[in-house]
Structures are given as C-alpha cells and as structure tokens.
C-alpha cells in the first residue's frame, strides 16, 4: 500500500472503506475515522473527536513507524471496522485526546 501524509487537519470519514496503506494526519480529525475500513493504518497526531463504536481498543504503544518516520507517542491503538470484519488500525495520539482516557479501563481486564 501507499502512504498519504496530511500536514493539516481533516474532516470526517478519513480512510472510509480503506483496504490497505497508511494515512498520517498531523492535525485534527472531525471524527468517524476508518468507517468501513478493512485494512491499513491511520495515524492521527491531533484530536480525533470520538472513535466509532465498531472499533476496539487493543493497547497503548510508545511509538508508531509510518513510512521512514518513527513518531514518539504514546498512541492508543484501535482495531476495526469490526462491522466489516476489518483489521484496520487507528493510532491516536494520547496527549491530544484526553476524552479517550476512559477507554483505558478496557485495557486492564
């Protein structure tokens, strides 16, 4: 797959129906990241709004490598879109998304 780098912010539905490749968003997202995605990775360094309920949180990663760049985190790692049987990955910068901290309780189980 290829790599798309967005040096600013994006609207809704980034990566809709995505099957592979990588998208790096250096700014914010208006939400609904990865709707209907089946594969690939989306990395958001800014605020992402909310995560679709068809994604599950897997872990917190200290870094993410995208293209030739290793980006320091930490990052929340989500998998989905489970409604589509997808195995796409969302890497969401923890520092920019305090609204997601409540999801960490699902990691302790």
Regions found by a protein language model. Name each.
Residues 5-7, 12-109:
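Intrinsically disordered, low-complexity terminal regions
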